[in-house]
Amino acid sequence: MTKYTFKPKDFKAFNVEGLDARMEAVNEYIRPQLHELGEYFSDFFTSQTGETFYPHVAKHARRSVNPPKDTWVAFATSKRGYKMLPHFQIGMFEDQLFVMFGIMHEAKDKATRAKVFERKFKAIQQLPDDYRVCLDHMKPDKPFIKDLTDDDLKEAIQRAINVKKGEFFIARAITPQDKRLKSDKAFIAFLEETFDQFLPFYSA
Protein backbone atom coordinates (compact mmCIF):
# COMPACT_ATOMS: atom_id res chain seq x y z
CA MET A 1 0.00 0.00 0.00
CA THR A 2 1.50 3.32 -1.05
CA LYS A 3 0.93 6.60 0.74
CA TYR A 4 2.39 9.29 -1.53
CA THR A 5 2.70 8.06 -5.09
CA PHE A 6 0.22 7.60 -7.94
CA LYS A 7 -0.62 4.59 -10.08
CA PRO A 8 -1.37 4.89 -13.83
CA LYS A 9 -5.08 4.25 -13.08
CA ASP A 10 -5.18 7.30 -10.78
CA PHE A 11 -4.45 9.56 -13.76
CA LYS A 12 -7.54 8.14 -15.47
CA ALA A 13 -9.66 10.17 -13.04
CA PHE A 14 -9.27 12.98 -15.61
CA ASN A 15 -11.03 10.87 -18.26
CA VAL A 16 -14.22 10.58 -16.22
CA GLU A 17 -17.06 12.54 -17.85
CA GLY A 18 -19.02 15.21 -15.97
CA LEU A 19 -18.08 17.54 -13.13
CA ASP A 20 -19.52 15.59 -10.19
CA ALA A 21 -18.27 12.21 -11.38
CA ARG A 22 -14.79 13.53 -12.10
CA MET A 23 -14.56 15.30 -8.75
CA GLU A 24 -15.59 12.06 -7.08
CA ALA A 25 -12.78 10.23 -8.92
CA VAL A 26 -10.23 12.94 -8.05
CA ASN A 27 -11.31 12.82 -4.40
CA GLU A 28 -10.99 9.04 -4.31
CA TYR A 29 -7.84 8.40 -6.34
CA ILE A 30 -5.74 11.57 -6.13
CA ARG A 31 -6.60 13.89 -3.26
CA PRO A 32 -5.55 11.54 -0.41
CA GLN A 33 -1.98 11.44 -1.75
CA LEU A 34 -1.97 15.21 -2.31
CA HIS A 35 -2.85 15.71 1.37
CA GLU A 36 -0.06 13.35 2.43
CA LEU A 37 2.41 15.11 0.12
CA GLY A 38 1.18 18.41 1.54
CA GLU A 39 2.08 17.34 5.07
CA TYR A 40 5.44 15.90 4.08
CA PHE A 41 6.68 18.74 1.91
CA SER A 42 5.38 21.64 4.02
CA ASP A 43 7.71 20.24 6.71
CA PHE A 44 10.46 19.79 4.09
CA PHE A 45 10.27 23.42 2.89
CA THR A 46 10.02 24.74 6.45
CA SER A 47 13.19 22.87 7.44
CA GLN A 48 15.02 23.87 4.24
CA THR A 49 14.18 27.59 4.34
CA GLY A 50 13.56 28.40 8.01
CA GLU A 51 10.18 29.87 6.99
CA THR A 52 6.86 28.22 7.80
CA PHE A 53 5.24 26.70 4.71
CA TYR A 54 1.61 25.65 4.37
CA PRO A 55 0.09 23.15 1.93
CA HIS A 56 -2.87 24.12 -0.26
CA VAL A 57 -4.68 21.24 -1.96
CA ALA A 58 -6.80 22.39 -4.92
CA LYS A 59 -10.50 22.35 -4.07
CA HIS A 60 -11.93 23.30 -7.50
CA ALA A 61 -14.78 24.85 -5.50
CA ARG A 62 -15.69 27.52 -8.07
CA ARG A 63 -16.40 24.99 -10.79
CA SER A 64 -20.06 24.62 -11.71
CA VAL A 65 -19.91 23.06 -15.20
CA ASN A 66 -16.47 22.14 -16.53
CA PRO A 67 -14.62 19.31 -14.78
CA PRO A 68 -10.98 20.00 -13.83
CA LYS A 69 -8.26 18.95 -16.30
CA ASP A 70 -5.62 18.98 -13.57
CA THR A 71 -5.22 19.11 -9.81
CA TRP A 72 -2.39 19.90 -7.42
CA VAL A 73 -1.02 20.72 -4.00
CA ALA A 74 0.82 24.04 -3.69
CA PHE A 75 3.21 25.21 -0.97
CA ALA A 76 3.59 28.81 0.17
CA THR A 77 4.34 30.82 3.31
CA SER A 78 0.75 32.02 3.75
CA LYS A 79 -2.01 30.01 5.41
CA ARG A 80 -4.60 31.92 3.40
CA GLY A 81 -3.41 31.05 -0.08
CA TYR A 82 -0.53 30.63 -2.49
CA LYS A 83 -1.44 32.44 -5.72
CA MET A 84 -0.15 35.82 -4.52
CA LEU A 85 3.28 34.37 -3.63
CA PRO A 86 6.13 32.49 -5.27
CA HIS A 87 5.21 28.87 -4.64
CA PHE A 88 6.04 25.23 -5.23
CA GLN A 89 3.57 22.77 -6.76
CA ILE A 90 3.10 19.04 -7.21
CA GLY A 91 0.25 18.27 -9.59
CA MET A 92 -1.04 16.22 -12.44
CA PHE A 93 -2.82 16.28 -15.78
CA GLU A 94 -4.06 13.04 -17.34
CA ASP A 95 -0.73 12.49 -19.12
CA GLN A 96 1.82 13.86 -16.65
CA LEU A 97 2.83 14.41 -13.08
CA PHE A 98 4.46 17.84 -12.78
CA VAL A 99 6.58 19.61 -10.18
CA MET A 100 7.03 23.39 -10.41
CA PHE A 101 8.32 26.51 -8.74
CA GLY A 102 7.46 29.99 -9.86
CA ILE A 103 5.05 32.88 -10.02
CA MET A 104 1.46 33.04 -11.25
CA HIS A 105 -0.06 36.05 -12.96
CA GLU A 106 -1.94 36.87 -9.72
CA ALA A 107 1.26 37.28 -7.69
CA LYS A 108 1.72 40.42 -5.60
CA ASP A 109 4.69 42.53 -6.76
CA LYS A 110 4.96 40.11 -9.68
CA ALA A 111 7.44 42.20 -11.67
CA THR A 112 9.84 42.41 -8.73
CA ARG A 113 9.45 38.76 -7.76
CA ALA A 114 9.88 37.51 -11.34
CA LYS A 115 13.23 39.29 -11.59
CA VAL A 116 14.81 36.44 -9.62
CA PHE A 117 14.63 34.45 -12.85
CA GLU A 118 16.33 37.29 -14.72
CA ARG A 119 19.13 37.39 -12.15
CA LYS A 120 19.43 33.60 -12.17
CA PHE A 121 19.29 33.26 -15.95
CA LYS A 122 22.50 31.22 -16.20
CA ALA A 123 21.37 28.96 -13.34
CA ILE A 124 18.15 28.20 -15.23
CA GLN A 125 20.16 27.21 -18.29
CA GLN A 126 22.40 25.01 -16.16
CA LEU A 127 19.54 22.93 -14.76
CA PRO A 128 19.68 19.25 -15.84
CA ASP A 129 18.41 18.36 -19.33
CA ASP A 130 14.99 17.11 -18.20
CA TYR A 131 14.00 20.43 -16.61
CA ARG A 132 11.39 22.57 -18.30
CA VAL A 133 9.56 25.87 -18.14
CA CYS A 134 5.83 26.44 -17.77
CA LEU A 135 4.44 29.75 -19.00
CA ASP A 136 0.76 29.03 -18.35
CA HIS A 137 -0.15 26.85 -15.36
CA MET A 138 -3.53 26.02 -16.90
CA LYS A 139 -1.97 24.23 -19.87
CA PRO A 140 0.04 20.99 -19.85
CA ASP A 141 2.70 22.36 -22.26
CA LYS A 142 6.14 22.56 -20.66
CA PRO A 143 9.02 22.91 -23.14
CA PHE A 144 12.45 21.66 -22.14
CA ILE A 145 14.83 24.47 -21.17
CA LYS A 146 17.55 22.89 -23.34
CA ASP A 147 15.31 23.32 -26.41
CA LEU A 148 14.89 27.08 -25.87
CA THR A 149 17.23 29.67 -27.32
CA ASP A 150 18.64 32.39 -25.05
CA ASP A 151 16.17 34.80 -26.65
CA ASP A 152 13.21 32.45 -26.08
CA LEU A 153 14.04 32.17 -22.39
CA LYS A 154 14.71 35.89 -21.96
CA GLU A 155 11.43 36.71 -23.68
CA ALA A 156 9.50 34.29 -21.43
CA ILE A 157 10.98 35.87 -18.29
CA GLN A 158 10.33 39.40 -19.59
CA ARG A 159 6.73 38.48 -20.29
CA ALA A 160 6.30 37.41 -16.65
CA ILE A 161 7.82 40.72 -15.53
CA ASN A 162 6.00 43.06 -17.91
CA VAL A 163 2.71 41.46 -19.00
CA LYS A 164 -0.25 41.29 -16.62
CA LYS A 165 -1.13 37.70 -17.58
CA GLY A 166 2.51 36.59 -17.76
CA GLU A 167 3.70 33.67 -15.61
CA PHE A 168 6.97 31.82 -15.23
CA PHE A 169 7.71 28.47 -13.61
CA ILE A 170 10.66 26.14 -13.74
CA ALA A 171 9.31 22.62 -13.92
CA ARG A 172 9.84 18.91 -14.27
CA ALA A 173 7.30 16.40 -15.58
CA ILE A 174 7.07 12.62 -15.84
CA THR A 175 4.55 10.24 -17.43
CA PRO A 176 2.10 8.09 -15.45
CA GLN A 177 4.22 5.02 -16.34
CA ASP A 178 7.50 6.47 -15.06
CA LYS A 179 9.48 4.12 -12.81
CA ARG A 180 9.88 6.93 -10.25
CA LEU A 181 6.17 6.55 -9.50
CA LYS A 182 6.50 2.83 -8.75
CA SER A 183 7.17 3.28 -5.02
CA ASP A 184 6.85 5.94 -2.33
CA LYS A 185 10.61 5.83 -1.76
CA ALA A 186 11.46 6.47 -5.43
CA PHE A 187 8.77 9.16 -5.76
CA ILE A 188 9.82 11.09 -2.65
CA ALA A 189 13.47 10.89 -3.76
CA PHE A 190 12.50 12.31 -7.18
CA LEU A 191 10.52 15.15 -5.57
CA GLU A 192 13.24 16.03 -3.05
CA GLU A 193 15.89 16.02 -5.78
CA THR A 194 13.70 18.34 -7.89
CA PHE A 195 12.94 20.73 -5.05
CA ASP A 196 16.63 20.85 -4.12
CA GLN A 197 17.23 22.23 -7.63
CA PHE A 198 14.35 24.72 -7.25
CA LEU A 199 15.20 26.06 -3.77
CA PRO A 200 18.08 28.37 -4.82
CA PHE A 201 15.56 30.26 -6.97
CA TYR A 202 13.26 30.68 -3.97
CA SER A 203 15.94 31.98 -1.62
CA ALA A 204 17.66 34.24 -4.17
From Swiss-Prot:
SUPFAM superfamilies, per database record: YktB/PF0168-like
Gene3D superfamilies: Protein of unknown function DUF1054 (3.30.930.20)
Domain of life according to the entry: Bacteria
Pfam families, A to Z: DUF1054
InterPro entries per UniProt: UPF0637, UPF0637_domain_sf
TM segment ranges: none
Membership in a protein family: Belongs to the UPF0637 family.
Name listed for the protein in its UniProt record: UPF0637 protein SAR1080
Organism: Staphylococcus aureus (strain MRSA252)
